[in-house]
Each structure stands twice: as structure tokens, then as C-alpha cells.
């Protein structure tokens, strides 16, 4: 199975599926476990956006420009295919992530956001997406970075604008 553009549906027409409110491309949109809130990550023309809260009225909105290299790419090994986008704000980093077990046939995606205190990356909160139908594009963050003209330099461990060696 090719990794570029792998979209996990996550049945957009099914009842209970989160309707994304992105101006650009939806990376993930899911209901949050144990609440009526929505977690959403979008790829916009200049970078990624993150929103969290009730549908249509998020309590928190953050942005991470492509130039800051906010995507933590899947290294290509391990049981799970995953991707994450990091949104720094006010002494914290909100890391929205999506993952799927690649060894389990028809595995449902999992996702959520981990909140880290900065500096030091101390995990202070972890919020999971509710199981069930929701939308996620596993390789969407990497694809958005590439579409914006960036490539991941594996030797340096960072995103470069333009070509990579």
C-alpha cells in the first residue's frame, strides 16, 4: 500500500461523523472522547490551523506556519503509520496526531492531541478522539508540507524549503 495520500475514512457520510470547518484541506476532524467538543487540524495556504471546542464555536484556535516546520513525520518503521503537527502557544505545545496500525486489516484510526509544557516537553494532558466514524488523512501533514515547497531532510532531521540533498 502506498503511503502518500492514504486517507482513512472514516465514512464521511455516516451519522455522527464530524463535519470539518476548514477553509483549506482537512487533515483530521474528530469528536473528543467524553465531551461534545471537536478537534480539527487543517492545512491552509500559509500553514496549519488547530481548533478545539464545540462545533462552530472553538474555544482554542492555533496556527503553525509551514516555515516553522511543525510536522513530525512518520519515520517509515514500526507497527503504526502516524503523523503529528505541533502548535506552540503560551508556554505549551499542542501536538495533534493521527495513527493507524498497519498490521491489522481494516484497522480504525486513532488520534488526539497531547499537550506538553515548554520548555522540557513534559506531557501535561492527553485528549483522545472518540472511537467511531471520523475523518483523518494519515499522510496529510507531510503532503501539505511538500505542496508548500518543503521537504524532510532525514540527515538533518528538519524541514527544508526547496530541494533536499
Task: Name every feature range the model reports, one short phrase each.
Residues 2-9:
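Sec-dependent signal peptide recognition
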Residues 14-17:
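N-terminal signal peptide c-region/cleavage motif recognized by signal peptidases
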Residues 20-165:
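Cysteine-centric segments in proteins
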Amino acid at each position: 500500500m502506498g503511503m502518500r495520500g492514504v486517507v482513512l475514512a472514516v465514512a464521511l457520510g455516516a451519522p455522527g461523523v464530524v463535519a470539518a470547518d476548514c477553509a483549506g484541506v482537512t487533515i483530521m476532524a474528530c469528536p473528543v472522547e467524553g465531551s461534545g467538543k471537536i478537534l480539527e487540524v487543517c492545512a491552509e495556504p500559509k500553514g496549519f490551523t488547530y481548533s478545539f471546542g464545540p462545533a462552530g464555536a472553538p474555544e482554542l484556535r492555533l496556527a503553525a506556519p509551514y516555515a516553522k516546520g511543525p510536522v513530525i513525520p512518520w519515520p517509515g518503521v514500526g507497527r503504526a503509520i502516524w503523523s503529528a503537527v505541533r502548535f506552540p502557544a503560551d508556554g505549551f505545545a499542542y501536538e495533534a496526531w493521527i495513527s493507524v496500525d498497519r498490521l491489522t486489516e481494516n484497522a480504525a484510526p486513532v488520534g488526539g492531541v497531547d499537550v506538553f509544557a515548554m520548555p522540557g516537553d513534559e506531557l501535561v494532558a492527553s485528549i483522545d478522539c472518540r472511537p467511531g466514524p471520523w475523518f483523518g488523512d494519515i499522510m496529510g501533514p507531510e503532503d501539505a508540507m511538500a505542496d508548500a515547497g518543503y521537504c524532510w531532510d532525514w540527515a538533518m532531521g528538519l524541514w527544508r524549503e526547496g530541494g533536499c540533498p
